[in-house]
Amino acid sequence: MARTATIVRETSESKVELSLNLDGTGKTDIDTSVPFYNHMMTALGKHSLIDLKIKATGDTDIDAHHTVEDIAIVFGEALKQALGDKRGIRRFADATVPLDEALAKAVVDISGRPYCVCTGEPEGFEYCMIGGHFTGSLVRHVMESIAMHAGICLHLHVISGRDPHHIAEVEFKALARALRFAIEPDPRVDGIPSTKGAL
């Protein structure tokens, strides 16, 4: 069964068209209307090996927040849809990823219970403007939106970092690598990886 999803979400603030394939090679085609977010979502697809296509427009003349949030919501929904009943996946994974002076660790449980803990971002990071359109505060908001709508438990910890671009990027890459292993089929698991029999 193909682990794919396509979702279109349109509101008065944005229109998001997104498709993904969990069993891809990291091929991406990203146009979020927010240049730095293009970079982040491209990295997320590349390093998770999820084929990811996004076309989004929104009221970025007001602020990038609505469009960025809505893309994260749709990505989470698509991830949940593509995972189906989660039969045969590894479920748990973690990844620690460096980028020069920045280092972050992501731990993921594809549990069906949404939870997100983000820690370690340096004081003032949330106020940094990255790439002219993307504030540091949006990183946590993206992570929370993905976790809530995908139904996953995510712990993300920034261990070190100075450059706001590097800090944001390493958070996305750590999530990507953790997802890459958590969603991967485990050849030793035949059913649903839970003592409850459902996730």
From Swiss-Prot:
It is an enzyme of class 4 (lyase). Its EC number is 4.2.1.19. PANTHER family: IMIDAZOLEGLYCEROL-PHOSPHATE DEHYDRATASE, IMIDAZOLEGLYCEROL-PHOSPHATE DEHYDRATASE HIS7. It is found in: Cytoplasm. The keyword 4Fe-4S does not apply. It comes from the Bacteria. This is Imidazoleglycerol-phosphate dehydratase. Pathway: Amino-acid biosynthesis; L-histidine biosynthesis; L-histidine from 5-phospho-alpha-D-ribose 1-diphosphate: step 6/9. GO terms for molecular function: imidazoleglycerol-phosphate dehydratase activity. It comes from Bifidobacterium adolescentis (strain ATCC 15703 / DSM 20083 / NCTC 11814 / E194a). GO terms for biological process: L-histidine biosynthetic process. One of its GO terms (cellular component) is cytoplasm. Transmembrane segments: none annotated. Pfam families: IGPD. Keywords: Amino-acid biosynthesis, Cytoplasm, Histidine biosynthesis, Lyase. Its main location: cytoplasm.
